[in-house]
Amino acid sequence: MINRRHALGLLAAGSLLPPRSFANVSYQRSEFRDDLAKRFFDLATVGTFVGYKVDDYLIVASDKVRSGEAKLPASTFKIPNSLIALETGVVADPDKDIFKWDGVTRSIDAWNKDHTLRSAIAVSAVPVYQEIARRIGQERMQKYVDLLEYGNRDIGGGIDQFWLTGNLRIDPIQQVDFVDRLRRGVLPVSKRSQELVRDILPVTKVGDATIRAKSGLLGAEIGNPSLGWLVGWAEKGDQQTVFAMNMDCKEPGHIAARMTVTQQCLTDIGAI
């Protein structure tokens, strides 16, 4: 294990990624690849992909600029929101606690029903997670966002809006760091909460590989998507790769392309 501040400083010295303050992680080597950047060019958009190949202690990135740019996390914040809900007791059981539909018909049909935590994260039900955030409250939310060292830790802009339109920002490297700590079960919260969140993350099978990931789509709740995220990790045999991808969503096809381009990048680096 090496200090994350030192590791990211080395990456910056190598003109790959910017320095920032982190705790401990095993990153030791890094590279960026034009073939990954070309995946976004081929979609007529701009974006970034960062992969951490755990067994190789290798970070692979598509670029040295956007990979360090902090943006609103959108629904990728459902990962820490779920952890905090479980830690605070707002949710006791992700399969039994029911969040009743508020009766407001929204453009995404899957949101217009009752949900458990598991079903809500599966369809990325923003209203459910807004209610969860309100029940957690500003003080407890700030405490845990600080404890988890999540992004810039700024939850200004409204307790049910800060990850959608407010002040919270996180960059792809920070996403990889956070997700990797969840994957390893070393976040400063209970093992139970981490196990449950790992279990409820949406799963995609690609051949003999498994991808556990959460998407994000900035503006989805108002019908005006602009930025897409996908963060998580891929498992193939004993090999694991943690990743974060974001891209500008300039047309409807880019929404579905979030998973497609991520799979392409994971294939390019030999992760799946």
Language-model regions, residue ranges each:
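N-terminal secretory signal peptides and thylakoid transit peptides that target proteins
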Residues: 1-14
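Structured C-terminal helix/loop/strand segments within mature extracytoplasmic catalytic/sensor domains
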Residues: 6, 25-37, 70, 134-137, ...
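A short, well-structured edge-of-sheet supersecondary motif
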Residues: 28-65, 231-234, 245
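Active-site SXXK
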Residues: 70-94, 120, 243
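Short, well-structured active-site flanking segments
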Residues: 87-103, 189-193
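Mid-domain, small-residue-enriched loop/turn segments at the edges of structured enzyme/sensor domains
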Residues: 109, 113-117, 129-184
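Short helix- or helix-capping micro-motifs
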Residues: 116-124
